[in-house]
């Protein structure tokens, strides 16, 4: 085997050149045999070059450039340039400096012609994926960029691979139904980056909401503590505010409502309420906590404050009518639903319709709509709202003395508390296995 020249540590053992030409051959739809014959090279030797097992002899890169009609530059200049940039960009992401993050990414993408013909090709495409996930969200482009990186992991160092997994985690975390996919990527990221503060910090932080949303609130609470410790060392106090906020939500999910209300109120008192853009989210969390704690007047108060401050959350649509229902203010409840139903998100309409049907003793409509909504919660892994609905269903079957259904919903409640309730395991759906 030819002697391998010593190269900088962050490129050692990376297959930058071989992977580049391998990728080109594959996208051109050419077989290894065809290319080897066309350039009069041994097939096994060409395979070794493509897979980083041999150095490229003098003249071979030019030979392949001519064959593919490319202008590949194998110097490390552009790779090193991008390596420095990706660290700066990720640091901006970790510090919530979205303006700088986007500005740097757009500057790099403006030099596509340079980077795509250099040793920085794969790192450039990783940064392109970074931009797509953070600022474009075109699913087709994201999947194409993801496949390109996944097919050439031998050209990505472990630190950049951890960034790849982290941004994929961010992408899949946006939809509750893919939270478990996001968790897998964040864990992969942490396995590679435990000693890289920025990456470990962001991954740990992102896992908080995943655990909270997937009925693992105690674990989410412990990750709040882990995350706070890392961000404190980084002196990233902005993110520490969010950690405190998430910890309040964990307390709510654990049923520690008074502790959550106290902590949320302290956070509210410690910020400038006239300018803070997250004030509506905090009102929302307080409204939700009061709803679960059966303090319905307070729930209505903070729901209205959240709406007045333009909180975008769709689930607010049922806080007020449900509170009216529980307070036996049935006319107010029906009037509210009638005037707001057409503006509600389709996901929550069955719940609103079930409340209306329950008041009017339209039992068939109630059962149809509440089961449809419960099924949607399970199907989309929206675990946070499940206990409220389970108790709503239990109250109904208790009132109608349907012992078979009481047993079924009690089994589901136990499964939820045991952390193993899924759409498939739920006892309420005859067709749950389909």
Predicted region positions:
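Alpha-solenoid helical repeat architecture
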Residues: 116-122, 156-163, 195-206, 234-246, ...
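Helix-turn-helix repeat elements of alpha-solenoid scaffolds
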Residues: 93-108, 133-149, 173-188, 214-226, ...
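Short C-terminal boundary/hinge segments that cap the last helix of small helical domains
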Residues: 69-85
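A short, Lys/Arg-rich alpha-helix, primarily the initiator
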Residues: 1-28
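Tandem amphipathic alpha-helical repeat scaffolds
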Residues: 84-95, 123-137, 163-177, 201-215, ...
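DNA major-groove recognition helix of helix-turn-helix/homeodomain DNA-binding modules
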Residues: 57-74
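Amphipathic alpha-helical segments of tetratricopeptide repeats
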Residues: 106-113, 146-154, 187-194, 225-236, ...
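Short alpha-helical DNA-recognition segment
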Residues: 28-48
């Amino acid at each position: 085997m030819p002697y391998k020249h010593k190269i900088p540590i962050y490129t050692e053992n990376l297959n930058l050149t071989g992977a580049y030409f391998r990728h080109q051959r594959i996208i051109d739809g050419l077989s290894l045999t065809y290319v080897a014959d066309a350039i009069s090279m041994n097939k096994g030797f060409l395979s070794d070059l493509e897979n980083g097992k041999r150095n490229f002899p003098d003249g071979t890169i030019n030979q392949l450039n001519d064959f593919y009609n490319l202008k590949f530059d194998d110097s490390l200049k552009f790779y090193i340039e991008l390596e420095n940039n990706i660290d700066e960009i990720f640091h901006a992401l970790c510090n919530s400096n979205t303006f700088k993050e986007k500005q740097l990414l757009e500057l790099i993408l403006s030099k596509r012609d340079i980077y795509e013909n250099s040793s920085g090709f794969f790192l450039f495409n990783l940064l392109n994926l970074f931009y797509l996930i953070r600022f474009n969200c075109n699913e087709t482009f994201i999947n194409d960029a993801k496949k390109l990186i996944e097919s050439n992991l031998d050209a990505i160092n472990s630190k950049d691979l951890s960034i790849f997994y982290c941004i994929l985690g961010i992408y899949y975390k946006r939809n509750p139904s893919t939270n478990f996919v996001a968790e897998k990527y964040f864990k992969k990221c942490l396995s590679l980056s435990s000693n890289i503060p920025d990456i470990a910090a962001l991954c740990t932080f992102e896992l908080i909401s995943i655990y909270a949303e997937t009925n693992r609130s105690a674990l989410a609470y412990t990750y709040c503590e882990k995350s706070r410790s890392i961000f404190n060392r980084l002196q990233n106090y902005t993110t520490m505010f969010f950690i405190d906020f998430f910890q309040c939500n964990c307390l709510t999910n654990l049923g520690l409502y008074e502790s959550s209300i106290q902590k949320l109120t302290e956070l509210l008192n410690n910020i400038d309420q006239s300018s803070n853009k997250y004030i509506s989210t905090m009102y929302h969390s307080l409204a939700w906590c009061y709803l679960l704690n059966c303090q319905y007047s307070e729930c209505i108060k903070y729901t209205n404050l959240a709406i007045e401050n333009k909180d975008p959350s769709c689930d607010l649509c049922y806080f007020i009518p449900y509170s009216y229902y529980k307070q036996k203010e049935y006319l107010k409840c029906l009037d509210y639903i009638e005037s707001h139903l057409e503006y509600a998100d389709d996901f929550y309409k069955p719940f609103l319709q079930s409340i209306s049907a329950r008041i009017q003793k339209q039992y068939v409509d109630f059962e149809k709509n509440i089961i449809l909504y419960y099924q949607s919660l399970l199907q989309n892994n929206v675990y946070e709202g499940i206990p409220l609905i389970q108790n709503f269903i239990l109250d109904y079957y208790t009132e109608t003395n349907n012992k078979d259904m009481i047993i079924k919903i009690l089994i589901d409640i136990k499964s939820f508390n045991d952390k193993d309730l899924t759409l498939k395991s739920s006892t309420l759906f005859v067709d749950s296995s389909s």
